[in-house]
């Protein structure tokens, strides 16, 4: 019965998505369709409305709109150029300096803005012209830009990790933020290894001349105010000075002060940023609300228990089960955006992982890491196609290089999956677990 209900949910969901129905409505309709065989229609609709309201009324959910607004303000604040100059001043002498600079800057910018697509667009456009002048293949720079754009989604502050906290029943946001650093850095390092190897193979050299300490000092001073946002907000949250929600509001105030000091926005552009952020936040908050319907349906029909029993009937080896889950998440991530996928798969797979002793922290990082890979993989791959568009190249030219990045990034995924300390060492050291 439970497996049949799961198949109904997936079938209806896929059909509705194929027809172009917004993901929020598709989740609600597919969930209700699956449970109508068990309870009365009126009861199902009333309960669905109540679950949606409960899901949208969680106080911790207010952190997401604030972080979205702060990220959008910073996107318009001219920080990409400052970060690129800062990283280039440090790494400019390396082989393929522009590739490595792109990777590291994407990690920093993605952490500040909270968006892989925004990082790929802003940083990629800054790198592109210099790369063209130095004879870099546009396909190589586009692949590097796209592949590294998602590392910032793992490095806090991360809306994906906040969403997972809500979906998992209140996992500590501070612990998740602390846990995200090592996987995010692993992602960036994997990309750096591939970038340097490509640079050596293709003959891309660093900037000539001696290391310029004066330029480094100037670039550091220019980038420091932007980088301080991460230090202030994350330091305050992890240190217990304020909650994630309060930290998100502080991030907005800090971003506003910085943007006005840089004179990068005015009142007219600020209003547009607020409206765009409100639209984006409305979609996310409503999505979180309707995902509560899915969680209720799965719990009512005992779908996670049935899935666990089905997997255990195949094998009792937890490592094989984790590999199967990774494959499912990787494939699903290529068709779905990160937020809805988190809300769908958390209630399905988290109980299974908890049954063999995995912490909610580690599962959260495995989940988000997988879905980030999907964000740079066709056929949907939002960040991938942004990188291709910014790089002025084509998918067919980029994919041979992307395959190299996929191998390295999936290697990082295996570390996150099979070595718990990768996700749990920092939270445990900080007393957050």
PLM region descriptions:
Residues 1-433:
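Alpha-helical transmembrane segments of multi-pass membrane transport proteins
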């Amino acid at each position: 019965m439970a497996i049949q209900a799961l198949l109904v949910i997936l079938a209806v969901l896929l059909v509705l998505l194929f027809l172009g129905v917004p993901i929020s409505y598709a989740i609600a309709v597919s969930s209700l369709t699956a449970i109508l065989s068990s309870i009365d229609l009126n009861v199902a609709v009333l309960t669905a409305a109540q679950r949606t309201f409960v899901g949208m009324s969680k106080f911790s959910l207010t952190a997401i709109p604030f972080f979205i607004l702060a990220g959008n303000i910073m996107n318009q604040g001219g920080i990409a150029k400052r970060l690129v100059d800062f990283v280039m001043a440090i790494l400019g002498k390396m082989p393929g300096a522009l590739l490595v600079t792109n990777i590291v800057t994407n990690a920093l910018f993605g952490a500040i803005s909270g968006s892989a697509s925004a990082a790929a667009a802003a940083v990629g456009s800054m790198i592109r012209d210099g790369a063209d002048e130095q004879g870099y293949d546009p396909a190589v720079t586009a692949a590097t830009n796209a592949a590294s754009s998602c590392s910032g989604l793992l490095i806090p502050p991360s809306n994906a990790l906040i969403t997972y906290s809500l979906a998992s029943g209140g996992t500590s946001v501070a612990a998740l933020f602390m846990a995200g650093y090592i996987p995010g850095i692993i992602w960036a390092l994997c990309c750096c290894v591939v970038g340097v190897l490509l640079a050596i193979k293709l003959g891309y050299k660093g900037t000539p001349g001696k290391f310029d300490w004066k330029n480094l000092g100037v670039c550091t001073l220019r980038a420091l105010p932007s980088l301080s946002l991460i230090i202030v907000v994350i330091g305050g949250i992890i240190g217990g000075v304020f909650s994630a929600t309060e930290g998100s509001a502080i991030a907005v105030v800090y971003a506003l002060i910085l943007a006005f000091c840089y004179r990068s926005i005015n009142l007219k552009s600020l209003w547009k940023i607020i409206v765009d952020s409100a639209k984006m936040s409305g979609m996310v908050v409503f999505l979180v609300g309707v995902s509560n319907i899915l969680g209720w349906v799965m719990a009512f029909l005992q779908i996670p228990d049935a899935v666990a029993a089905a997997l255990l009937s195949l094998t009792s080896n937890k490592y094989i089960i984790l590999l199967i889950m990774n494959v499912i998440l990787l494939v699903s991530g290529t068709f779905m955006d990160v937020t809805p996928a988190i809300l769908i798969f958390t209630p399905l797979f988290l109980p299974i992982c908890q049954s063999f002793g995995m912490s909610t922290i580690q599962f959260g990082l495995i989940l988000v890491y997988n879905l980030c890979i999907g964000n740079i993989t066709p056929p949907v791959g939002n960040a991938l196609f942004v990188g291709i568009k910014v790089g002025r190249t084509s998918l067919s030219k980029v994919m041979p290089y992307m395959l190299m990045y996929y191998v390295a990034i999936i290697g990082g995924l295996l570390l996150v999956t099979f070595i718990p300390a990768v996700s749990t060492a920092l939270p445990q050291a900080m007393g957050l677990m």
